[in-house]
Amino acid sequence: MRVTTSFPLGTLRDTPSEAEIISHQLLLKAGYIRRVNSGIYAYMPLMLRVVEKISAIIEKELNSIGCTKLLLPQLHPADLWKKSERWEGYTAGEGIMFNLKDRQGKEFGLAPTHEEVITSIASETINSYKQLPQCFYQIQTKFRDEIRPRFGLMRSREFIMKDGYSFHSSENDLASFYEKVGNAYENIFESCGLQTVGVDADSGAIGGASSKEFMVTADAGEDSILFTQSGSYAANIEKAVSLPSQPIPLKDNIAEWLETPNQKTIQEVCDNNNLDPSQIIKVVILLAQFENEFNAPILACVRGDQHINEVKLFNLINKLHHFNLLNLKKIEDKNTIEKNLVDLPLGFIGPDLDNKTIKASSNWEKKWTRIIDHSASDLSKFISGGNKVNFHKVFQEFSFNSKNYLIGDIRNAKKGDKISIDDDEELKEKKGIEIGHIFQLGQKYSEKLNAKFSDKDGQLKNLWMGCYGIGVTRIAQAAIEQNHDQKGICWPIQISPFEVIIIPTNLKDPIQSDLTEQIYNNFLINKIDVLLDDRNDRAGVKFKDAELIGIPFQVIIGRDSINKEVELFCRTNNTKIKISTDKLLETFISESEIMYNKKS
């Protein structure tokens, strides 16, 4: 390919102001993507080649374990999503599905994921155990109405994803295939030149019994990973479990009531009363909004030195009611409080808050759903809000069971926690970028969409399902987070748009021009993925662009061309060798093979 005719380089001299993280900055500056609108990007020719190379790696690996590629519609009828009971959750409030009505008034959604459609198809095409197992996958554009698109392709409204779905006759067969896909994912990410870690994860809106995320560790990551140094445990903070540190016991001579004027935070109470946060129970009030406009006020308690994990809390609340939970948010809006609550001592709320604080005129449930974390319920003596402005209270032998509290794990595990009583190993923390996620869905969708098969005994059974996603465009950006320097991108050769770029310093020199064409054609004949920078720009401009776009190897043709010598520069490790042109191809192939075979 030639820059002048096939691959114009749209590089920028200045860093775009809207880009917050380095990978986003470099994708824009190097001309790989162009912003069309918030969270919407055009993939320019260089970027498309990266996407195609990643897709080819994915296809090769998935095909090797028996998966079959197809293409599903992006426009989904609402009826399918209503059958799975996900329509309202994905379209109401902060739901992420773009939705519309056609000329006849029928509702549709732009696909953020495809569980409903593939299950509907499976219900029509799979009818016997003899057809199982089966796994289908596709690579296509997905749409998500992100509240705050940011970080380029990391959190965009339109992105390219590989999503796969498997169908099985038994839970054991699903579990076995789930592990096989997990191994395939590790091969895929290694083949893309990435360093990844697999972590236990929350299944979120997709659902299912268990799931695993694949993370690229990077400072720009939005997720927190907790792990042990030995590798025995790793989990997303949303899912991670641990043992909290031991609390400091309260002194015996402390007064029952503490006057705490304007001390509304845990730290303020501790600083003014010589207390430790582990001696306090923090109370947070939230509103759970369900389908059918059912609203339940939540009173959640956690030890003062811990933080509530809203994902764990959401999942726990969702299991308590017949309706699907759509949203969970803190009660802090003044109008909401005045309309629904009375005599609420904000900042001084205790675990024994009376149900009478909920107004009779409110459309909320007329009692608090009370939930407490294990770390707090174990305290025999603690301080909490006194349900009276400017006062906290000492609670002794407070029976959470008798107060209708649900006791569970609703706290964030954190760095320094131990993973179990029998293991002294402490958790460490890193930031990560999720690039893959696999789920054991069980029978959640097959049951609701009536996808059944006939077993060996002729009995109709619900299909067992798995779901497997990879963010194709996320892989590209995550690779840049792990592979860049001050000058630009340093692509892993496996997914680089080209393996080598040829840079003649002066094409007006006939010797350089002839040698450039010879080398270029020789590379093409030997099926080397080569880009020729045949612009008449200054050499400095070409070098700067080459370093910015990050192609792994550069062949620099300069004054030594008269002696049939060129320079072979490796962008990855910044090494340069002078070499005769008759040894160039052999040396390049040898050096590039080392890169291809290098483990990430």
UniProtKB/Swiss-Prot annotation:
**What catalytic activity is recorded?**
tRNA(Pro) + L-proline + ATP = L-prolyl-tRNA(Pro) + AMP + diphosphate
- Subcellular compartments: Cytoplasm
GO cellular component terms, alphabetically, are:
cytosol
Keyword Protein biosynthesis assigned: yes
Q: Which PROSITE patterns match?
A: AA_TRNA_LIGASE_II (PS50862)
Q: Has keyword ATP-binding?
A: yes
- Keyword annotations: Aminoacyl-tRNA synthetase, ATP-binding, Cytoplasm, Ligase, Nucleotide-binding, Protein biosynthesis
A Gene Ontology molecular function term of the record: proline-tRNA ligase activity
EC number(s) reported in the record: 6.1.1.15
Which GO terms are recorded in the biological process aspect for this UniProt protein?
A: prolyl-tRNA aminoacylation
* PANTHER family, per the entry: MITOCHONDRIAL RIBOSOME PROTEIN L39/PROLYL-TRNA LIGASE FAMILY MEMBER, PROLINE--TRNA LIGASE
Q: Which function does this protein serve? A: Catalyzes the attachment of proline to tRNA(Pro) in a two-step reaction: proline is first activated by ATP to form Pro-AMP and then transferred to the acceptor end of tRNA(Pro). As ProRS can inadvertently accommodate and process non-cognate amino acids such as alanine and cysteine, to avoid such errors it has two additional distinct editing activities against alanine. One activity is designated as 'pretransfer' editing and involves the tRNA(Pro)-independent hydrolysis of activated Ala-AMP.
What is the similarity comment for this entry? Belongs to the class-II aminoacyl-tRNA synthetase family. ProS type 1 subfamily.
Q: How does it assemble?
A: Homodimer.
Domain commentary: Consists of three domains: the N-terminal catalytic domain, the editing domain and the C-terminal anticodon-binding domain.
Q: What is this protein called?
A: Proline--tRNA ligase
Q: Which organism is this entry from?
A: Prochlorococcus marinus (strain MIT 9301)
- Report the gene name: proS
